[in-house]
Amino acid sequence: MAWLIYFFEEPISIHLGTWFSVGDIQVNYGTLLDSLSMVVMVPVGIVTLSVLIYAIDYMRYDPNRNRFYIILSVFAIFMTVLVISDNYIMMFMGWEFVGVVSYLLISFWNTRIAAMKSALSAILLNRMGDTLFVICIGTMLSYFHAVDFETMELMTPHTDTYMLNLMAMMLLMAATAKSAQLGLHGWLLSAMEGPTPVSALTHAATMVCSGVFVLVRSSFMLEYTPSMLLVMLWLAGFTTLMSGLMAVVSNDMKRVMALSTMSQLAMMMLAMGSSAYDLAMYHLYCHAFFKALLFMSAGSIMHSYMSETQDMRKYGGLINYLPFSYTTMLMASLSLMAMPGLTGYYSKDIIMESLYGTYTVSGYIMYYIATASATLTAIYSLRVTYLTFYNVPRSNKYTFAHVHESTHMAMPMFILTIYSMFLGYARDNVTFHLVMGLPHTNSFIETEYTLPAMFKLLPLMLGLSLSLTTVYMYEFTYKMSKSSVYNYFNQRIYYDQLTNNLIMRPVLKLGGATNAYTDNGLLRVLGSTGMSRALINIPVLLMMNMTYTFIVFFTYMKYFYIIPATRGRKLYMILYTKCMINIFHTPEAGII
């Protein structure tokens, strides 16, 4: 069926049933198999299968490996639900379960405190985007009385621009959280505490790409909100530039690749911001394979070490010990660098060309920012390869004696290497296929034939020249890289410190004050705690009142009818007063 949809361009919508009906609002659930969903399902299926085969050997000695395989399979199932759903509510179910299962995968090694903190950070930051997604769905139900894509696409041209901007803004923020764009990107780096197969799956074709997919699926709405497209364009531009600068100075291999993912997702957002949705999906399609291969190659290197360290400064000289991992990482890195002839070249460079082809001020600025980001990509890709394989060996003889490669892990890596090298040659089929179902306001065909050759070659020339400069710096003038700017980006632009000081600490203080004045204050007196204590002490109060009445009555009788009016009556009144004070100032009497 998938091949029929792919080649004959006939979408299939399968109605499975009615979920609920309230008044004139009826929400169904079903599947939509069109060109967009099929293009995403191809990398999801291939990468998931490759990761599962890879994980069989990677997790061989883990006592909880069966649980890992189950969670990984459930993750792929809900990613499929997200992709083939025919309405926003069903899509949100897949979106939400993907986030929950990613929490379980990141915290799989739950004996590590860093893994648990990272998983908590991931799910809390994604809650911000999920909240806006829910509000957007509620707005659709209130305004359109429908959430299926077909109805929304038909009604969008007749909708108020303010309402469309509001919904587009909420979808953009949801995608910003899920796809780790600047401002809500903190969870992506800490998510590297999970097993490497998790990183290969979630940061290649599944979780982080779901935000891009939702925006492309909502392209019929975004085309009527040019202001939101402009915001998306500038947000993506800053994201791809800052992530590249942070990756250049990072020493953790997996975090460099996570920042690379963040940069490439921003490239996809740049394409969407310039209304080139087909190019965004084509880059997602190609990026999934070589990024999964990069993570698998990194996992093979770490798995070969006894300590499984991720610090590239402790590697070096591995080209003779891990020749297959070197070959796969080199091919994936060259594809990421957009080397001519490889997959990344066909999907990445055309996005930068389409930015210039918009012929607007923002388009020109974003073209140069994207070119700078592509140059940084070449620099940190070559840096990873150099420090790992070409540098002077940094480990001891005992470590190198146990370095080895796994033949079981090599098979899925070989398959992804083929895709990373030759998938770009299917460019025409994929891009023209995508244009059939997506808006094509910015046509790459016009850009291809009108752009000067200099702007096509500029990213390649800058990438090669500055990469060679990086090698020179590491070989001869390494101290040049030690500066305050280096430290600034090595600390990830102090994002964690700013978040803690400006958001987390004030929120925690506000929460503590709220707890003191409500939970331990008002609710303790007027709430269930105060009422229960009052009910418990009612019998005590009744007995005290009865005792008080009896004593007053007895005193009155004795004072006026028994004791004569002498000094004894005065002495009796003094003793009686002291006795009453002692009775009514006991701790039991003071409980209310």
From Swiss-Prot:
Its EC number is 7.1.1.2. GO terms for biological process: ATP synthesis coupled electron transport; electron transport coupled proton transport. It is an enzyme of class 7 (translocase). InterPro entries: NADHpl_OxRdtase_5_subgr (IPR018393), ND/Mrp_TM (IPR001750), NU5C-like (IPR003945), Proton_antipo_N (IPR001516). GO terms for cellular component: mitochondrial inner membrane. Keywords: Electron transport, Membrane, Mitochondrion, Mitochondrion inner membrane, NAD, Respiratory chain, Translocase, Transmembrane, Transmembrane helix, Transport, Ubiquinone. It is found in: Mitochondrion inner membrane. It is a multi-pass membrane protein. The chain crosses the membrane at residues 36-56, 68-88, 89-109, 132-152, 169-189, 196-216, 229-249, 256-276, 279-299, 322-342, 364-386, 406-426, 451-471, 534-554. It comes from the Eukaryota. It catalyses: a ubiquinone + NADH + 5 H(+)(in) = a ubiquinol + NAD(+) + 4 H(+)(out). One of its GO terms (molecular function) is NADH dehydrogenase (ubiquinone) activity. NCBIfam families: NDH_I_L. Core subunit of the mitochondrial membrane respiratory chain NADH dehydrogenase (Complex I) that is believed to belong to the minimal assembly required for catalysis. Complex I functions in the transfer of electrons from NADH to the respiratory chain. The immediate electron acceptor for the enzyme is believed to be ubiquinone. Belongs to the complex I subunit 5 family. This is NADH-ubiquinone oxidoreductase chain 5. It comes from Debaryomyces hansenii (strain ATCC 36239 / CBS 767 / BCRC 21394 / JCM 1990 / NBRC 0083 / IGC 2968) (Yeast). The lineage of its organism: Eukaryota, Fungi, Dikarya, Ascomycota, Saccharomycotina. The gene is ND5.
